[in-house]
Amino acid sequence: MELDQDQKVETPEAAENGKDEMQLEEQTQDEDTTETETETETETEAEAEGADGTILERTESVKAKLVPQAEKQIQDEKTGIKEADRAIQEQTQDDETEAEGADGAILKRSESVKVKLIPQAEKQIQDEKTGIKEADRAIQELPANAELAGVKIQAWWRGTLVRRTLLLAILSAWTIQSWWKETKSRLQGRKLHDVMRCRLRNLNLKSISRRKRPNQSSFL
């Protein structure tokens, strides 16, 4: 009976000790779980930092590759535009030189035509004057009844000579004017063709640069 009482007395203390041990075990498990979670979070943060570093390194490497390429493309485009401008200026100077040469040739030809036509016209006028004098002399030598016919012949001859002179002058002026219009239109057509070709080249360069820039920004 005394042993049973001792056991009954010790049983609450054992129960309390058991509870304390269970609480200690739970605390230990909680601490282990907390440490495990902390280690997991630390590893996750380290992995995230490593991934961020890798992304930054890759971004820097991509920038290091693309930036020189973009600068080179821009420099090439600027060089192409400068060359196109230089070609336009050279072509314009050549066209101006050709136009000046054509103007000089036209002036020389006009002078040569004048030099040729003026003596011819003077000779024709002199011949007309000589013909008129001869006709007057012939009329004076004709009898009185033939004077009217002589006057008609003289008037017809004078009209023929005047019409021929005017026709020659008109034909010469028309020839010079037609040649000048043809030369001018040919020079203007050549200049317009060169200007359009240079403009198309500049537009192609600009379109190429606009196509390349979005690709570069997408890489960055």
Swiss-Prot record:
The keyword Plastid does not apply. The keyword Coiled coil applies. Residues 146-175 form the IQ domain. It holds the Pfam family IQ. Residues 1-81 are annotated as: Disordered. Residues 1-22 have a biased composition (Basic and acidic residues). InterPro entries: IQ_motif_EF-hand-BS, IQCF. Residues 69-93 form a coiled coil. Keywords: Coiled coil. Residues 23-50 have a biased composition (Acidic residues). This is IQ domain-containing protein F3. The gene is Iqcf3.
